[in-house]
């Protein structure tokens, strides 16, 4: 819903888009129509959206439901978290922008990933685009280059609801063969 942000995203090196759509104020078609189209498009692996508001919440919910059934990730940068931001977004698009907690509930219900800035929107969408298949559980393995990174990774993961399961014995044996003797083969993994 922003021409300038659309141009900024298109200028991102190393990221390929099947479509880059600027809906503007949605005078002819609604943002929900574009999201619905991208959910059904076979060439689109991930739907990344800058969203100010919607006019038809039911249509948006239906698109999110279909994406969840297809296991197609939707990543949203939603404007209007603050009172002032909500008013600005509503005046820009003339759509339902407020009630941010309602959007959060809708995102949670259908597994839509909400991000906080453009960089996070791009990197999250890119991560899902290159994954061979989506994870079925909120578990994660991480490999880091320092003890500091490893500690931060463990903390941030827990804050985000991720768990780092212990490696299977077969994996531990392989890591012991590959890592220097002073390295501890645990998850998250410190490579130093």
Stretches found by the model and what they are:
Residues 1-192:
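Catalytic-core regions of core metabolic enzymes
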């Amino acid at each position: 819903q922003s021409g300038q942000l659309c141009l900024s995203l298109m200028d991102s090196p190393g990221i390929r888009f099947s479509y880059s759509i600027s809906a503007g104020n949605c005078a002819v078609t609604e943002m929900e129509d574009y999201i619905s189209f991208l959910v059904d498009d076979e060439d689109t692996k991930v739907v990344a959206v800058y969203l100010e508001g919607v006019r038809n919440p039911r249509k948006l919910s239906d698109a999110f439901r279909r994406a969840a059934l297809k296991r197609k990730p939707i990543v949203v940068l939603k404007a209007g978290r603050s009172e002032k931001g909500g008013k600005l977004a509503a005046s820009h698009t003339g759509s339902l922008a407020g009630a941010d907690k309602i959007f959060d509930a809708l995102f949670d219900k259908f597994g839509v990933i909400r991000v906080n800035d453009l960089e996070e929107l791009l990197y999250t969408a890119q991560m899902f685009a290159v994954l061979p298949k989506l994870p079925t559980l909120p578990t994660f393995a991480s490999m880091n280059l320092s003890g500091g990174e490893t500690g931060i990774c463990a903390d941030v993961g827990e804050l985000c609801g991720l768990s780092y399961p212990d490696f299977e014995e077969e994996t531990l044996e392989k890591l012991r063969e590959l890592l220097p003797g002073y390295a501890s083969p645990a998850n998250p993994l410190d490579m130093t």
